[in-house]
Each structure stands twice: as C-alpha cells, then as structure tokens.
Amino acid sequence: MADKLIRATAADGGIRVVGVITTRLTEEARQRHKLSNVATAALGRTMASALLLASSLKKPGSRVNIRIKGDGPLGGVLVDAGLDGTVRGYVDYPQVELLPNAQGKLDVGRAVGDKGYVRVLREEKGEGRNELQESIVEIVSGEVGEDIAYYLDQSEQIPSALQVGVFVGTTTGVTAAGGILLQVLSKEASRDEVLVARLESRLRKLTGFTPLLRAGKGLEDIFQELLGDMGLEIFPAVQMLRFDCDCSFERALGALKFLGVDELKDIIEKDKQAEAICEFCREVYNANERQLIELVESLQAESC
C-alpha cells in the first residue's frame, strides 16, 4: 500500500478529517538511521503527526517542524514535514531499545519520557517574507499522539482527536504506519464538546490504527468506520507522501565552514579530507583536500 494522504469532511463541514499511510517512508527512516524498534515507533509517530499538521498549511513551500524533547533515553525527536508531502527526521539516540510496556507494546512513552516539551514551528511561505508561528507545550505522556493532540488543544485551540501508530515486525521491519486527525471546525462551543466526545469515543473503540492497516483496510475504509453515519464526504484528491531531504554537497561544505580556519587546516594536514553526515537522512558527503583548501581560502578572504 503506497504512502498517501487523503482528506474528508463530515457533519456538514463541521468536522475536518485527514488520514495518512506512512509505512514505506517510516521503513526508509528505520533503515537510514539504523533505528531500534522503539526509536522507529517514536520517529514514525512523529513523522505521521507532522504530515497531518502540514496538511492544513496554505501556501506552497510551507512546512511544519516538530521537536519533542523528553527526559527518556531517546533524548529527543526532530521532524520536518511539508505541505508537498515530504518529510524527514531523526532521533538523538537511535539505538535505544526497551522492554515492551505492560500491554506488550513498544514503550514509546518511556523512551521519550513524560517530562519535557513539544515545540511546533509552522512556516507559511509568503511573498517576500515568511510567516513563522511557534508554540511550546509540556509533554503529556511521551506517546506522541497524545502530546500532539494536547498541543492542538492548548496552542491552536482546535478541538481535536488524533491517533498515530507504527507496527514494527520482529524480522520484517515496518509493516504498517500512519495516523488520522479529526478536528471540529464549528463555532458553537456546545456543539464542539458533543462532537469531540463522539469522535474521541469512536477513536477509542478502534482496535488501533495499525491493526486496521495490517488487516487490509485503507484510509477510506477507516473513515467510513468512524464517520460513515455523520455525512462523510471524502475528497477525491490523493497526495503521495515520501521521505525526502533537501541536503546537498554544497550545504555540507557550508557546514564545514563553521569549523573555522585553524581546525580546517588541521584536518588538511592530518587527514587530507573531511566527512559530513546529514543528521536528517544520514547521507554522507566527502570533501577532498582541494575542496578543503578552497574553504580555508574563502574564509580567509571573508575575514579581510
């Protein structure tokens, strides 16, 4: 099943629905970063959440950045997603592995930690100037989905129900990943409360998002199960999603500049080359002696 995003409305436009399947891109992230199972789940949930949030952006080129920094052994999670359906991300300590929780599931909450913060940065592209909106909230549980739902309630004040999940097989890698976001858009507070209660109740009754995907159900099927009796209208447009990083050799050289003239000269003398690795995708860039010398000359010219 291809990675994709679809949108829908229900309750006469009072409910906005977005769903994503992110199985392949989560598996790509697992392989690129050599992630443990619990790190895969944490990063995968955050990538699905970021893509769901990015779907509400308006202008081409706009992006959402999510940073989750908890007190657990993973250290932190950083994800960047765009309105164009691209996403990238990493965790601070990708090799961390923990025993399953009491329910026998990957213990993402303990890996992330229940103390810390969630920072969401929205960048809307504009003509001549980008509009930045940053919000920071406390971590609720470290399970990611609950934390992002809390952010939506506290910072954007949009009544929301969110469920994200990742299933990692013992030997097969990621076999199911994705999420669903339900938001109440009506202006009547009393109606909001009733709708949110119904949505949360229905989400709780689901056997979980990834079990439905593993059972062969698509996003449209899940939407029907949740909202089929509430005037559901699924939009025909389907957006394809992918893991994608905009790093480049030129950017890697720019990063090496921050080492400074003295350290670059030391590298030239001792190693004759330098290696730069992109944190988001683990792409490796190698600069040879000639390129390093040109960097030094450029820095010296800038200081004159």
Curated annotation (Swiss-Prot):
Record keyword RNA-binding present: no
Lineage of producing organism: Bacteria, Bacillati, Cyanobacteriota, Cyanophyceae, Oscillatoriophycideae
Superkingdom of source: Bacteria
PTM comment text: Under oxidizing conditions two disulfide bonds are formed involving the reactive cysteines. Under reducing conditions zinc is bound to the reactive cysteines and the protein is inactive.
NCBIfam families: PRK00114.1 (NF001033)
PANTHER family named in the record: 33 KDA CHAPERONIN
Membrane-spanning segments: none
Family: Belongs to the HSP33 family.
Annotated S-S bridges: C245-C247, C278-C281
Compartments it resides in: Cytoplasm
Protein name from the UniProt record: 33 kDa chaperonin
Organism annotation: Microcystis aeruginosa (strain NIES-843 / IAM M-2473)
Gene Ontology terms: biological process: protein refolding
Gene3D superfamilies in the record: Hsp33 domain (3.55.30.10), HSP33 redox switch-like (3.90.1280.10)
Molecular function via GO: protein folding chaperone; unfolded protein binding
Cellular component GO terms, alphabetical: cytoplasm
Pfam families associated with the record: HSP33
Annotated function: Redox regulated molecular chaperone. Protects both thermally unfolding and oxidatively damaged proteins from irreversible aggregation. Plays an important role in the bacterial defense system toward oxidative stress.
Key words of the record: Chaperone, Cytoplasm, Disulfide bond, Redox-active center, Zinc
Keyword presence, Chaperone: yes
